[in-house]
Every structure is written in C-alpha cells, then in structure tokens.
C-alpha cells in the first residue's frame, strides 16, 4: 500500500510497477505475486482495469469479486479497493492523460485522492 501522503502503490521488489504512455493515455502495470495484498488508492476518475495474468479477489464497498485472467472491470471513481492475489497476477489500470504528463508524481495527483476528504473536495471543485 501507499502512505497517507502518497496513497498509490510504488514500484518495489514485492509489487513491481511499470508505466506506459500513449497520446492521451497512461497505463500502469502492477505485478502481484502469490498471496500479496494491495490496498488501492481512491481514484478520481472512471477507468478500466485489465487482469491479463492470474487470479485475484477484489474487495470494495460493493463486495468481494473474484477475477481470473483474462478479464477487465470498469472501476468507478471514489472507490477504494483491496486486491488479493491467489497466484502471480498482472493488473493494468488505464487512465486518461489529456496533457500527456510523464511525471509520475504529477500524474498521481491528477488520478488519485489522498483520502476521502480530498476526493470530496475534488468533486466539489470539478
């Protein structure tokens, strides 16, 4: 998981992260090894997630769902999710990136909220 100041998971040996950029699109690849748990950040925008390898359980306020690759989900804004890997899994988040920003810290500020209060403030100012 991230920290209070930086809620998004960062690259590590336990959870390798890769970043890909295309015109107007940012894709974040996260590898989760067997029995890894990741607490996701609160995303500000509707986006699509793809599971291209593995088997995950994804818990949110809506409940717990299991996903086996290959599949995708539409991720609603304002949701916080917890992911559990039953086996090594590769998960992709796709985000709009209209300004083609490649600075990861700046992208994260645009994509995720630090906490629910930050998310509510974002919604009010939208």
Walk through the language-model features, giving the residues of each.
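Conserved short histidine dyad/triad with adjacent acidic residue
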Residues: 25-44
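Glycine- and acidic-residue-biased ligand/ion/polar-headgroup-sensing regions
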Residues: 43-62
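Short acidic-glycine-tyrosine-enriched beta hairpin
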Residues: 60-82
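A short, N-terminal "cap"/entry segment at the start of jelly-roll beta-barrel domains
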Residues: 1-29, 61, 119-126
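Double-stranded beta-helix
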Residues: 86-126
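Structural motif
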Residues: 48, 55, 80, 88-90
């Amino acid at each position: 998981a991230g920290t209070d100041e930086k809620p998004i998971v960062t690259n590590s040996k336990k959870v390798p992260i890769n970043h890909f950029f295309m015109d107007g699109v940012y894709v974040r690849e996260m590898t989760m090894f067997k029995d890894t748990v990741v607490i996701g950040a609160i995303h500000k925008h509707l986006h699509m997630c793809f599971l291209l390898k593995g088997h995950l359980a994804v818990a949110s306020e809506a409940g717990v769902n299991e996903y086996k690759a290959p599949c995708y989900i539409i991720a609603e804004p304002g949701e916080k999710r917890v992911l559990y890997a039953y086996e090594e899994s590769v998960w992709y988040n796709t985000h709009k990136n209209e300004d083609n920003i490649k600075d990861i810290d700046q992208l994260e500020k645009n994509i995720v909220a630090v906490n629910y209060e930050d998310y509510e403030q974002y919604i009010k100012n939208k």
